[in-house]
């Protein structure tokens, strides 16, 4: 019996075979690109070890920072700090940016720029300032702007001893040319830390880690690749970046228990979409070098807001940007005719404050020996010119970020800028400072595994929650009008809180130059440390108390972690229960406090621990209450109490 013929296999056509070969080659090429470039540079997706909990940022780092990048001398730092103090701006931290050393990075202060560095910086510490120094991971053979521009001996010493990764492999970067310190070499670290101790011994509080770590690389033949040999073996760019942040942070903590590093989170999301710093070293983060303008495509404030919110989605907690941007010149159309008219017609709105100059120098005859003042733009020379409304709106946005970083290129002496800039930036600088108890409490919660301080929302361009109780919709263009998408719930406009707005809803309204689109949740309990009258919630006398803003609705509570006891986490919990009467309960740590309670009507009685409190014309004395009918606020001031249980009645 004959076998049936086996069907012949259909022979593939030559176009198919060519396409298949091309497909295989493409897959191989993609795999090579991924394993040789993408994986060692980004670490994606094998980087879960970088996504741990954020460290506990100390409260001082949440207060206002100041710096400049045009002069960089002791005399100019003094002028900045003395001027900000004279005009009553809150400044806790001064950032010393490059160049400050003899060469990059020997950590030796250039005494031409800082004639008596130890005396100067110890003196700043004695005045209550925190001091942070700029640095990178580079050991340079050539430096562009330091006192010693040729430093081959410095580089060769490190290379010959094996202190540099890749046997001293050098790259060009924006400050010169050098090699990478080897964070895996114990002897290299001993030498490196010895250099750093020159300033750490004076009480330095942190490093600004600039972004040379992302340049870590080597060569395969003539091909530049994102990996190189270190003391312990091969190291990728991504691994080097993690060592850079972690080592500098951890060693700093051995010298100062409140040490921080200022390090990038995102800086244009396509450069490192996984984030520059590992989360577990990200005490304070910023988003790189933005320009003094509005638009995203120009790397203006829209770019900063976008990068900050994307950083928050990655889990970074304390994030910010250079107020007004880092560099560049504002575009001619950044200040339109309507805004220019508002700036030109600005009338002072500041309350009288003791020991603060009553008049901006731009409105008076120029003081002897001082530079004439511009009433339109700042007096920065060259191309780093900042439009006034850019400075104002950026400062307002930064108020509702964890990191308020006022500095960069351009005129930063606000008393030499316009009157509205001086008054509005001062007002919002104080508002940010007064919100530190609220921010710090959320930072503690994030450190313990909770959500970040800033929480981007899906609805509304650039909308985010700032902690549990504030909705922020930043102004990102030269317009007074903004449409805000309110989430579900009830909300009040923070700068005029009379009206309750029901969400979800879209609200369109004008926001004057000295206000910002911020809404507070009905039911919010907000701790603040009021120290000045600029924000309208107290004055200098309030500094002895913790001020609590209460917007009663149903049951709500807030746990305050006291900044002044850091790193010990002492807390006070305030519970609010509203109905026919209002009950407020304090528990745990006792502290003098002022309650500012939204109330449509004046109460008939106020008691604490079953004891009736007297009404006063104004709550200037302890153990009394007053009612501000204009603002519909009940104000209670208490220094001592037994249990801290209030009962407020309207019958």
Language model segments and positions:
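Catalytic-domain carbohydrate-binding cleft regions of carbohydrate-active enzymes
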Residues: 39-514
């Amino acid at each position: 019996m004959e076998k049936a013929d086996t069907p012949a296999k259909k022979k593939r056509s030559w176009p198919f075979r060519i396409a298949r070969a091309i497909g295989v080659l493409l897959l191989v090429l993609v795999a090579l690109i991924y394993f040789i470039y993408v994986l060692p540079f980004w670490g994606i997706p094998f980087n879960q070890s970088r996504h741990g909990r954020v460290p506990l940022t100390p409260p001082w780092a949440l207060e206002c920072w100041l710096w400049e990048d045009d002069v960089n001398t002791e005399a100019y730092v003094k002028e900045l700090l003395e001027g900000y103090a004279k005009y009553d701006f809150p400044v806790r931290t001064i950032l010393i940016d490059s160049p400050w050393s003899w060469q990059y990075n020997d950590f030796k202060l250039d005494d031409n720029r800082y004639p008596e560095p130890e005396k100067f910086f110890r003196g700043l510490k004695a005045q209550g300032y925190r001091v942070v120094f700029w640095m990178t991971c580079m050991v340079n053979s050539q430096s562009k702007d330091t006192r010693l521009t040729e430093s081959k001996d410095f580089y060769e010493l490190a290379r010959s001893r094996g202190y540099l990764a890749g046997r001293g492999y050098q790259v060009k970067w924006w400050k010169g040319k050098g090699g990478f310190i080897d964070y895996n070499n114990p002897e290299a670290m001993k030498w490196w830390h010895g250099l750093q101790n020159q300033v750490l011994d004076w009480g330095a509080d942190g490093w600004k880690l600039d972004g040379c770590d992302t340049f870590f690389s080597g060569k395969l033949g003539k091909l530049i690749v994102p990996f190189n040999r270190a003391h312990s073996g091969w190291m990728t760019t991504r691994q080097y970046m993690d060592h850079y942040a972690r080592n500098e942070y951890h060693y700093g903590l051995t010298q100062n228990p409140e040490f921080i590093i200022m390090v990038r989170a995102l800086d244009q999301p396509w450069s490192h979409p996984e984030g520059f710093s590992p989360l577990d070293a990200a005490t304070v983060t910023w988003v790189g070098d933005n320009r003094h303008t509005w638009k995203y495509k120009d790397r203006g404030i829209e770019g900063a807001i976008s990068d900050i919110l994307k950083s928050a989605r990655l889990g970074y907690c304390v994030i910010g940007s250079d107020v007004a941007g880092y560099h560049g010149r504002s575009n001619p159309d950044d200040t339109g005719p309507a805004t220019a008219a508002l700036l030109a017609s600005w009338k002072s709105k500041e309350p009288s404050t003791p020991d603060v100059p009553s008049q901006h120098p731009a409105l008076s005859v120029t003081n002897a020996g001082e530079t004439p003042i511009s009433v339109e733009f700042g007096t920065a020379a060259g191309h780093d010119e900042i439009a006034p409304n850019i400075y104002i709106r950026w400062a307002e946005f930064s108020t509702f970020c964890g990191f308020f970083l006022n500095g960069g290129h351009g005129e930063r002496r606000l008393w030499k800028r316009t009157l509205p800039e001086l008054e509005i930036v001062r007002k919002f600088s104080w508002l940010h400072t007064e919100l530190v108890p609220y921010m710090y409490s959320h930072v503690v919660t994030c450190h313990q595994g909770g959500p970040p301080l800033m929480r981007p929302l899906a609805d509304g361009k650039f909308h985010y929650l700032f902690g549990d109780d504030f909705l922020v919709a930043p102004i990102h263009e030269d317009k007074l009008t903004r449409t805000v998408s309110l989430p579900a719930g009830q909300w009040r406009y923070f700068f005029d809180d009379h009206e309750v707005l029901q969400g979800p809803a879209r609200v369109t309204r004008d926001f004057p130059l000295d206000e910002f689109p911020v809404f507070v949740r009905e039911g919010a309990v907000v701790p603040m440390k009021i120290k000045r009258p600029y924000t309208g919630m107290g004055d200098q006398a309030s500094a002895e108390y913790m001020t609590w803003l209460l917007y009663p609705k149903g049951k709500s509570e807030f746990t305050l972690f006291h900044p002044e006891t850091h790193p010990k986490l002492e807390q006070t919990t305030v519970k609010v229960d509203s109905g026919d009467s209002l009950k407020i309960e304090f528990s745990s740590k006792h502290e003098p406090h002022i309650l500012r309670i939204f109330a449509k009507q004046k109460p008939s009685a106020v008691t604490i621990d079953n004891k009736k409190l007297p009404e006063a014309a104004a709550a200037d004395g302890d153990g009394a209450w007053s009612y501000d009918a204009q603002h519909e606020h009940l104000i209670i001031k208490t220094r001592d109490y037994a249990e801290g249980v209030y009962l407020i009645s309207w019958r």
